[in-house]
């Protein structure tokens, strides 16, 4: 669920900005608090579980993975909220065509990264890590 919320925030924030869709941008801004709250709640559950039980290696690995991805997902949603907020500042009216393409490309890669991460997490797979690092480097190279 969090992965879907994060990818929705990224794609919605980007399209809000590029299409100058103030309603969509406002929805992303308003929804950010809900994502933050869900992330905080999940971290709290994980911390409680870690402190109150003897865990087998598989469950411990799962909980550590949650502690690793949740802050990253929350940060991505916060960045999407910031992008959406630029719509309300009328930034979309002055973005060049080249910049629009770059912003869309960065968003597309970020959405794909979170979709891949979500799929890998659900499957319990570690095989996505190299591809995710590569995609992250791709975004860095665009910036």
Could you describe each region identified by the protein language model?
Residues 1-143:
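Cytosolic, long alpha-helical scaffolding segments
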């Amino acid at each position: 669920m969090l992965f879907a919320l994060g990818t929705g925030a990224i794609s919605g924030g980007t399209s809000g900005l590029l299409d100058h869709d103030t309603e969509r941008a406002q929805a992303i801004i308003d929804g950010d608090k809900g994502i933050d709250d869900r992330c905080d709640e999940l971290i709290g559950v994980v911390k409680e579980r870690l402190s109150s039980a003897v865990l087998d290696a598989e469950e411990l690995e799962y909980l550590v993975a949650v502690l690793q991805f949740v802050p990253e997902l929350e940060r991505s949603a916060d960045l999407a909220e910031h992008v959406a907020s630029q719509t309300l500042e009328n930034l979309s009216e002055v973005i060049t065509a080249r910049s629009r393409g770059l912003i869309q490309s960065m968003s597309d890669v970020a959405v794909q990264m979170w979709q891949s991460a979500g799929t890998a997490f659900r499957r319990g797979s570690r095989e996505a890590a190299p591809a995710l690092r590569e995609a992250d480097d791709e975004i860095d190279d665009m910036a």
